Every structure is written in C-alpha cells, then in structure tokens.
C-alpha cells in the first residue's frame, strides 16, 4: 500500500497546528490537540486508512458521485469498540481524516463529529452522519467485523438485475473463490467462526435484498440476511450495490475485491450463456 491519501494533509497539520493544545468552546474543539495531530498523521490510523481506501475505490469506480461508504473499527487501538465512519455526501476522492464520525459500541454513542474539528480544516462545512451507519453497526454487532465496506459497484448492480427474481447470487468452480473465508456457526459460542478459506469446488452464495428509498431502511433486511446466511461475508442490494465486511480492514478489502471480480466475471458468463454454478 502506498502512503495514505496521496496528499499533504499530514504536513499541513504539522505546519499549522504544531503548537496546539486541547481546549473547548461551547463543547466544541476550538484548537487541534496533540492527540488529534498524532491521530491524523499516523498512516495506519483508521481515519487515514479510510481516506486511502476511498481514493482507491473511487479509482475503481465503486464510490463515485459521493456514493458508497467505508467504516473501520479500531481493533488494534486501546478501545476496539471505536468505529470510524466516513460522512454522508462528501466526494470520496477528496476525503480527509478529520472528516470522520467516531462512534462507540455497543451503545452507538457518537464520540466525535467533523463539526467538532477547527473550522480552519473543515471550512465550516456542515457534515452529516452516513446513512449507512445503522447497517455498518449491524455488521459489527452481528459478525464482530473489523471493517465494513459499501460500494455502488456496477458489477454488483448488474448481477442483481440479471437475477431480478432471485434472492441470492451463487457461483462455483472459479479460482478467485479461494480468497474468501469459509464460515460456520458455532452452536456453543453462538458466533460465526472462520474455519478456513473457500476452495475451488465450493459454491459461493451471497444473499440479495431489495432496495429501499432510504439507506437506513435497509437495516432490517440486512440483519435478516446476515442471520439467514451465516456463511456469507457480503449482502447484495438490488439495483443499488453491495455491503462487504471482514475481521480486519485488509480482510474486508480483499473480500470486496474478490467478490467484485467474481461479479464482473459472472456478468460476462451470463452474457455468454455460461452457467454460474458448475454441476
């Protein structure tokens, strides 16, 4: 991976706020604390990783027109219950680390918003929480995920159109399936556990849920799909896109890339009249 964001926000922070100390005005951060400086300059911090991945996903045509979203749980930090979420309505290729919403699990309490950050950085823009937030939270609470990705991949949308009357997408006997985890529900722990990786002969099954006028209204359907498909690491949303999660941000990235590859291939197979599942 290259340095996050491919921009100079870290240097700008050092130049502009190197002597800042923490203070509040009417409950808002009025100057940038040393802690926030360190956070925004750490290339492996979740806020910076979201920026890096947003730019990569934008280049892949997955999050254009402010669509899509990414969230990362700080699994390696002092508080693994903290979740960083990209805001709603921002251009993903220009997103900055200080634009994230910070939510704490399990009570979903908002710890920090971009509106708490000094206006020198945010230019007085009024940020809104991502409409994907309740869906991201569902992935964290139901699957103990470390990251959740939502894209508007055209391959995902096209495949749900090919399967207009179907409730799931299936494909088998494709090498790329090996990149995805083999999951199983543990009756004793009542949790989904990874028992290895999928194999060439395995059949990948991803549930499809129906789209709704508002993103947050997808929550119940997403939760139902997660419950009914314990072996899935993703949920397709018809005529909309896909949600993908993983135990870490890098696993989620790999799963998303592998699934998108399989969806693109599946679209071509459909057009060529080739069955997606080999008997």
Curated annotation (Swiss-Prot):
Q: Which domain of life is it from?
A: Eukaryota
Named in its record, the pathway it takes part in is: Amino-acid biosynthesis; L-methionine biosynthesis via salvage pathway; L-methionine from S-methyl-5-thio-alpha-D-ribose 1-phosphate: step 2/6
Residues binding Zn(2+) are: 150, 152, 240
- Active site as annotated: 175
Query: What does the record note about the cofactor?
Result: Binds 1 zinc ion per subunit.
Q: What class of enzyme is it?
A: lyase
> What Gene3D superfamilies does this protein map onto?
Class II aldolase/adducin N-terminal domain
Any stretches that span the bilayer, and where are they?
Answer: none
What is the required cofactor set for this protein?
Zn(2+)
What's a BP term from Gene Ontology annotated to this protein?
A: L-methionine salvage from methylthioadenosine
Localization, per the record, is:
Cytoplasm
User: Chaperone: is it a keyword of this entry?
Assistant: no
Tell me which PANTHER family the record gives. Answer: METHYLTHIORIBULOSE-1-PHOSPHATE DEHYDRATASE
The protein's name in its UniProt record: Methylthioribulose-1-phosphate dehydratase
Annotated source species:
Candida tropicalis (strain ATCC MYA-3404 / T1) (Yeast)
This protein's gene is called: MDE1
């Amino acid at each position: 991976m290259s340095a996050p964001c491919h921009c100079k926000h870290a240097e700008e922070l050092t130049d502009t706020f190197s002597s800042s100390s923490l203070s509040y005005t009417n409950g808002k951060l009025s100057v940038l604390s040393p802690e926030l400086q360190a956070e925004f300059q750490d290339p492996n911090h979740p806020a910076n990783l979201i920026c890096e991945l947003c730019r990569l996903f934008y280049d892949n045509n997955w999050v254009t027109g402010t669509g899509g979203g990414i969230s990362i749980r700080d699994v390696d930090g002092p508080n693994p219950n903290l979740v960083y979420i990209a805001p709603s309505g921002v251009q993903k290729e220009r997103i900055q680390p200080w634009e994230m919403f910070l939510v704490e699990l399990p009570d979903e309490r908002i710890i920090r918003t971009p509106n708490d950050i000094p206006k020198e950085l945010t230019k007085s823009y009024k940020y809104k929480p991502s409409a994907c937030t309740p869906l991201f939270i569902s992935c964290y609470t139901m699957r103990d995920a470390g990251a959740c990705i939502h894209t508007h991949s055209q391959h995902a949308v096209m495949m749900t159109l090919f399967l207009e009357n179907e409730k799931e997408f299936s494909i088998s006997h494709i090498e790329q399936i090996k990149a995805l985890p083999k999951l199983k529900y543990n009756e004793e722990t009542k949790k989904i556990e990874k028992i290895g990786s999928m194999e060439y002969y395995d059949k990948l099954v991803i549930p499809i849920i129906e789209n709704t006028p508002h993103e947050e209204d997808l929550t119940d359907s997403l939760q139902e799909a997660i419950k009914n498909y314990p072996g899935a690491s993703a949920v397709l949303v018809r005529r909309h896109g896909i949600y993908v999660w993983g135990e870490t941000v890098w696993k989620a990235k790999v799963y998303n890339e592998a699934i998108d590859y399989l969806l693109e291939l599946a679209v071509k197979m459909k057009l060529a009249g080739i069955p997606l599942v080999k008997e």
